[in-house]
Amino acid sequence: MELEKVKINSLHCNDAVLSSLQASPSATSPQSVPSKANVVTEASIIEKTNQPHNVQEDNNYNRDCDSPESSSSEQDKELDDLRNLHSSSLTNSVVVGKSTGSLNGVYSITSVTSETKTLESVVTTNSASGSACLSNTPTADHIKKRIPSSRTPTRKALRIKFYRNGDRFYPGITIPVSNERYRSFERLFEDLTRLLEENVKIPGAVRTIYNLCGKKITSLDELEDGQSYVCSCNNENFKKVEYNTGSQPLSNLPLSNSRSNSHRLAKCRPSSPLKNGLLAGSSPFPACGGGTGNGSPLIASRLSDRVTVVHPRIVTLIRSGTKPRRIMRLLLNKRNSPSFDHVLTAITQVVRLDTGYVRKVFTLSGIPVVRLSDFFGSDDVFFAYGTERINTAEDFKLEAEEQRAINVIRKTMRTTGTTCKGPKPKMPIKSKKVYPPLVDSEPFKAETTPEDDRHAALLTSTGMEINELPSNIRNTYSLGRIIGDGNFAIVFKIKHRQTGHSYALKIIDKNKCKGKEHYIDAEVRVMKKLNHPHIISLILSVDQNTNMYLVLEYVSGGDLFDAITQVTRFSENQSRIMIRHLGAAMTYLHSMGIVHRDIKPENLLVKLDEHGNVLELKLADFGLACEVNDLLYAVCGTPTYVAPEILLEVGYGLKIDVWAAGIILYILLCGFPPFVAPDNQQEPLFDAIISGIYEFPDPYWSDIGDGVRDLIANMLQADPDVRFTSEDILDHSWTIGNKGNECTTYKR
């Protein structure tokens, strides 16, 4: 048994249609139909419509219908015929009313006999003329049509345009936004991050959306169709600039919800060390199957040019004006230099011309700079002009004072070697407490001493009792030797009783850090957020009244300070491996807005092979780490590795970690730090650090290449504004070179 569906949208039918209806199985006598089957479900939907597209849709359904003009009397007669026809065959009648020119869509579902024929007649009404027709085809089996349901209307997605925060040249990207497509704000953030990474360099994931007036958007319901918004990454504040609202967006994504649209959210994206710890030497644009995602050849070409041309470098800028002119420096990298216009904007923000934007740039020899690659060639000094007139005879000549200023800048970036006078500088002394011989010389002694007695002896040597250990740690792990110590904590090697895996147990004495408890809380809070192959993992944390216990990942090779004291200096290949791993860890931290503040060899753990070569480096000890929401002013760190802005107390941020990494790279290659003072006196040391002037003395640097010297010079810039970022370290040509991670022997 089937259901016969009749949809009546009009009140005008011809004789052929009426004959078809009378000959249909529904005319069977009621006695031949089982009583339970004599059920008629009637659904009448009457709605007024004046929308042109609805009329057009109805006309498409009835393009084969005969639609002559009919009078009111003819319609009345046809209505009576239809009533008589249905009343003779249905247990419940179908109500059919007189057309008023606005009747649209009357459904009738009638139970019939077991004959398997289905009739679906679609009739439309033209609301303007009051005339329509009943669709008819030769056989009922061939007139099945899908009836759209008005109960589940398709919601139209909002068409929203998004800009990159502070980027006045980025033309924006337009995407459809709806509650069906994005169930949460975080999902929209993920898609915006992926789309922006394909077109511009961004410092991290999209975290905030603003309107063009700077108001923060907190829900999808606040977005308006056809409006523009600004995407902010990490903790960036809204930058009120003249966004490129009149330009054509880079990518206008279709509004279709079809999953077959492979171009909607292309997953072809640069591999980034921020999230997966990959080395910078890996291919930044992996091939994507199925074509270029979201992609025009113009965008792909632009990204390719940026990758091949742009590299981190510091340029010197001479501001146009009255002589002697102001001399400034600017760090160019992939974030602020994706195009020629972006570089002009960056220069404008630094030189601050009285005439406004920088319009023209010249080299020191007076050659106009017209391409992006010109900023990354052999010239590193440029004149910046606005709309003012240029006197080529005088403007490109440097006065003595201007030349001296440029020479001072170049001196701070010196990469040539000088002869070292006097004895070779030494590494600073590693602070370490002295414990009884039981701990240092005979760490385990399990054969002669019961385990509990050995644990008690180890803890007693540090002023602790065996019962002070938390039960879940005492029952799960076997205590080993002391492997590290600091001002507030001590670190034991422990072993899991069931698996035999080694871990490190850090015990922080709260009594020794009175008033600094927030550092302990910050360390645990930060480490719980981290997951990176070159950062020590936190396995378990237990907080008690007197101590904080942290079970950490164990690295077998010890810390980098001990490795340096054993081998004195490392080869460039070994140093490259370590700086890659350290740079990847810092980039990951900085992308989350976290600064370590105590990067030094004692806090870098290394894994060695059987020949003593470094295979892996991991960053540890987050006791001073914190999240950066604004400039920090607390003076902390280790004197040898402290950055100038910390000593000057002018406020500092993420780049103090880059300075410390530059000191470490210098030490790896020659065995001593760039800034030293006699007898380890702090005042002369701090003066040297603030000056930012150091040398690459021979013979210790005679066999070391210019590439790594250039990297060190950029990492040890006293001015944090022009100092390399952690990403710039990974992008440098020396760091990218020899990607194979091949191990070579130490330099003895």
Curated annotation (Swiss-Prot):
Active site: D598
Chain positions with Phosphothreonine modification: T91, T100
EC number assigned by the record: 2.7.11.1
One Pfam entry name: Pkinase
UniProt record similarity statement: Belongs to the protein kinase superfamily. CAMK Ser/Thr protein kinase family. CaMK subfamily.
Protein name: Serine/threonine-protein kinase CG17528
Domain Protein kinase positions: 477-735
Coiled-coil spans in chain: none
GO cellular component: cytoplasm; nucleus
Catalytic activity: L-seryl-[protein] + ATP = O-phospho-L-seryl-[protein] + ADP + H(+); L-threonyl-[protein] + ATP = O-phospho-L-threonyl-[protein] + ADP + H(+)
Entry keyword set: ATP-binding, Kinase, Nucleotide-binding, Phosphoprotein, Repeat, Serine/threonine-protein kinase, Transferase
Residues engaged in binding ATP: I483, G484, D485, G486, N487, F488, A489, I490, V491, K506
Source organism of the structure: Drosophila melanogaster
PROSITE patterns registered for this protein in UniProt: DC, PROTEIN_KINASE_ATP, PROTEIN_KINASE_DOM, PROTEIN_KINASE_ST
SMART domains, sorted: DCX, S_TKc
Gene Ontology MF terms: ATP binding; calcium-dependent protein serine/threonine kinase activity; calcium/calmodulin-dependent protein kinase activity; calmodulin binding; protein serine kinase activity; protein serine/threonine kinase activity
The organism's place on the tree of life at top rank: Eukaryota
Biased composition annotated in UniProt, kind: Polar residues: 22-35, 47-59
